[in-house]
Amino acid sequence: VLAVVLMLLASVAFPAEAQAIPESSALYRLQLERETARQFGLDAPVARIAAQIHQESGWRPTAQSPFAQGLAQFTPATAKWLPQVCPEVGPPDPWDSSWSLRAITCYDAWLHRRVRAQPAGRALDECSRWAYTLRAYNGGEGWLNRERAKAAAAGANANDWRQVEKYRVRADWAHKENIGYPRRILLVLEPRYLRAGWPGKAACG
């Protein structure tokens, strides 16, 4: 009887979780796993970057916003610049899904390597490091670094993403969008993809 009950529960829970993830993601999963492993190694954060793509475009390669294009929502300027630090992505083409998957994984890895613990405060944990990586992707590395510096100058811990959220040097609307970006990816969407069986482990467990 218990086995039957468990099977029924699974049959109810799995479709609900699957419905929360766009079906189109299955078309890109294998390439995303390959590209993420290429950039991050065997413990690649596939579910995390899948969650980021979900946030960016809902897995729609034709997605377009006023300033960004494609699956990973690169601006034309960033797409043009990216091969300077990620030559392996090839000629910029945000509308091409294969290019976008190469680009988002390489750019995330590049930004992740550049996040440094500031001298004061506790060590930089992986949750904060990824929050800063995602904020840099979304709103620019320079703005983020200035806000971390402002937090440190005020006596806050610049290595704690929650403390840094309180400090702003950009427009209020841009700051709200930027701090909300990693919150949704790390706290809402990544756990959803992990529960659905995408590889990785939670950065903010």
Q: Residue ranges of each PLM-predicted region?
A:
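Short secondary-structure boundary/capping segments within folded domains
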Residues: 40-43, 62-63
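Extracytoplasmic
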Residues: 44-48, 54, 66-69, 129-130
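Short amphipathic alpha-helical segments enriched in leucine
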Residues: 37, 53-54
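Non-catalytic cell-wall polysaccharide-engagement segments
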Residues: 14-27, 31, 35, 39-40, ...
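Bacterial N-terminal signal peptides
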Residues: 3-11
